[in-house]
């Protein structure tokens, strides 16, 4: 055990309670990166990374922020292992997908982008399933 309590149930519950904050923090970092990239492209008048810029905005900033806000609006969504699985699928792939697009644009390597996109799709699908389950549980569907 690297540090006391790292793998305890209490630590896992703590992560799930703050999943909204983790998604919102990650989203804000993506926003800053995307705006910086956009400014750099504008200053240089080189828009060859525009696909990276748009994916960093939509996958990183918008989607992650919407995940975070949804978890904040519906705290019951963060209960259970599906929320943790969703975070573990979406957070890394939300960063790796735009990074893979960078590798595709600059080096012609499509595999990282494709792999990250598939993991991102799995996370998005899981989130959709979680929302539908919550809607049925609350009698909204």
Which residue ranges define each predicted feature?
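Hydrophobic alpha-helical transmembrane segments of multi-pass integral membrane proteins
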Residues: 2-141
């Amino acid at each position: 055990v690297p540090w006391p309590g790292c793998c305890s149930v209490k630590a896992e519950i703590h992560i799930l309670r703050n999943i909204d904050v983790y998604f919102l923090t990650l989203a804000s970092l993506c926003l800053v990166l995307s705006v910086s990239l956009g400014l750099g492209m504008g200053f240089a008048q080189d828009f060859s990374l525009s696909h990276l810029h748009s994916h960093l905005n939509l996958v990183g900033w918008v989607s992650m922020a919407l995940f975070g806000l949804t978890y904040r609006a519906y705290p019951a969504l963060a209960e259970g292992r599906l929320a943790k699985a969703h975070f573990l699928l979406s957070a890394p792939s939300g960063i790796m997908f735009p990074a893979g697009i960078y590798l595709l644009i600059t080096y012609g390597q499509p595999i990282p982008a494709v792999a990250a996109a598939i993991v991102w799709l799995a996370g998005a699908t899981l989130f959709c399933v979680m929302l539908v389950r919550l809607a049925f549980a609350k009698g909204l569907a």
